[in-house]
Amino acid sequence: MKKQSEVKRVSVNLTKRVRALFMGAALVLCLTTANYAAAQAGPPTVFLGSAGTFAVLAYAGVTNAGPTVVTGDLGTYPILSCTGLPTPCTGNGPGQVNGTINAGDVVAQHAQASLLIAYNDAKGRTTNPIGVAGDLGGRTLAPGLYKSTSTIGITGDLTLDGNGDPNAVFIFQIGSALNVATHGRIVLIGGAKAANVFWQVGSSATLGTYSAFKGTIMAYASITIATGATLDGRALAQNAAVTLDTNAVTKPY
């Protein structure tokens, strides 16, 4: 009887250990799956507040040359300068705005305040940053937070792959300037959307001639969109002007 009791006790203990091992393995699998899913989706989005309705927003005015088409609101605050666009801007064209023009009013003021918050949010992200430097042309990047301490260039195509997730977020922290070369492109694949791509630029951003860019640019200084370039996103300048020249700027949805 004593031997049977010992055998039974050993069997019970073994069963408990096996069960504990299975539970531990299941927990590790769940955590790994959750972490993988989070990595696939990238960081949380950047909330733009009232700046989100704007395709173009400047601090020191908006200047346009040529038949630019802006789809979304356009604003400037506190400097009211606005040329080459419809009234209330001076020149009454040749640019076109399919949205509301807010020149120096309280709406533009509130949008600038929201931009400051969004800019600082994007700049302050610190979770799992991926270091990048130099020219990003020719690369394919997954959702994530990308950090550069200096200037970033894009020559050729930079591909952003959403990995099948339409909510995948890409945030780029750029310590200095963003320079997109002539005919440089952002290519979105795998469900990636322009509305979920954010560029926090520590100085000025320049989109080269006939480039095709995607995402919301939040620049500390100026934004220049050269002749024939397109932007599926937003040009939001925190402390300087936005310059346009025969462009298509479309606020993403």
Residue ranges, per PLM feature:
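Solvent-exposed adhesion/ligand-recognition segments of exported proteins
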Residues: 35-253
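C-terminal segment of classical bacterial N-terminal signal peptides
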Residues: 19, 23, 28-38
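Bacterial N-terminal signal peptides that target proteins for export
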Residues: 4-25
